[in-house]
């Protein structure tokens, strides 16, 4: 976590017995002999999206929320007025822990009612397993991964369609809360979610069930258009801005990359 009582660039590790309260920056800088900059992966993803967002062509102060899902979790980066929202302890955007099912029970890897449990990419695997034996013709098995489900979804497999559609609905259900809490100009889904019109339509339809039409008209919900490693690209931008202050140079680099 970020310790607000020390230098802003000092990061301490907690929650890992063998690394408890290790100053990661100090250790890495001594090892590599170079300055170290650390940031949360979802925040880097969001910053890269903001830098290259088409919405910025008309408004440089566009606010943006980017959602990423890696395995079980969901993380979000929030950009307002060109700044990453950090929060008191640097955990702003940890929306995966947001409860969306009051009756959710405690599970081995968390609470079943959390957003990431219901809408992270791994949720599609559970939804597939729920009805696996109802679809004997499906190519999916008990060992099928999310990516195999996604391939089957693209081929129109009914079981895969059920699993991905349910994930899409739950994803939209959570985005509706984000829209009301943050009121962003755009919400961008990371590359782990299907970049398919039918999937995005399901997400948008879910959001529209819980968000007033006048608000829906003023928020863009779309999939990422970046093809690069977005997290790495975000880290690149952050490092450049910390090392260089020439905004013109940075803008030319941004135009070349986007």
Give the predicted meaning of each segment.
Residues 1-64, 198-210:
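Glycine-rich phosphate-binding loop and adjoining helix at the ATP-binding site
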Residues 6-7, 30-34, 54-59, 102-103, ...:
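ATP-binding/phosphotransfer module of carbohydrate and carboxylate kinases, centering on a glycine-rich
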Residues 40, 86, 223-225:
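Conserved residues in the N-terminal Rossmann fold of short-chain dehydrogenase/reductase
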Residues 41, 71, 235:
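Active-site glycine-centered loops adjacent to acidic/histidine catalytic or metal-binding residues
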């Amino acid at each position: 976590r970020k310790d607000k009582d020390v230098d802003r660039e000092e990061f301490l590790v907690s929650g890992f017995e063998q690394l408890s309260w290790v100053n990661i920056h100090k250790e890495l800088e001594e090892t590599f002999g170079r300055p170290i900059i650390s940031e949360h992966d979802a925040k880097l993803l969001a910053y890269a999206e903001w830098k290259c967002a088409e919405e910025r062509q008309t408004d440089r102060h566009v606010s943006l929320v980017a959602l990423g899902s890696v395995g079980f979790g969901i993380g979000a980066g929030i950009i307002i007025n060109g700044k990453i929202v950090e929060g008191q302890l640097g955990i702003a955007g940890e929306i995966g822990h947001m409860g969306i099912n009051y009756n959710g029970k405690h599970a081995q890897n968390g609470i079943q009612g959390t957003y990431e449990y219901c809408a992270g990419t791994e949720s599609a695997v559970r939804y597939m397993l729920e009805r696996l034996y109802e679809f004997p013709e499906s190519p999916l098995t008990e060992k099928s991964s999310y990516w195999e489900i996604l391939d089957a979804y693209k081929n129109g497999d009914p079981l895969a369609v059920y699993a991905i559609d349910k994930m899409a609905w739950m994803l939209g259900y959570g985005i509706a809360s984000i829209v009301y809490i943050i009121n962003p100009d755009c919400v961008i889904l990371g590359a782990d979610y299907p970049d398919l019109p039918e999937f995005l339509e399901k997400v948008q339809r879910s959001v529209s069930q819980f968000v007033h039409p006048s608000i829906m008209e003023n928020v863009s919900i779309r999939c990422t258009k970046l093809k690069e490693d977005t997290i790495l690209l975000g880290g690149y931008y952050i490092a450049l801005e910390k090392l260089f202050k020439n905004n013109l140079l940075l803008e030319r680099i941004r135009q070349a990359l986007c």
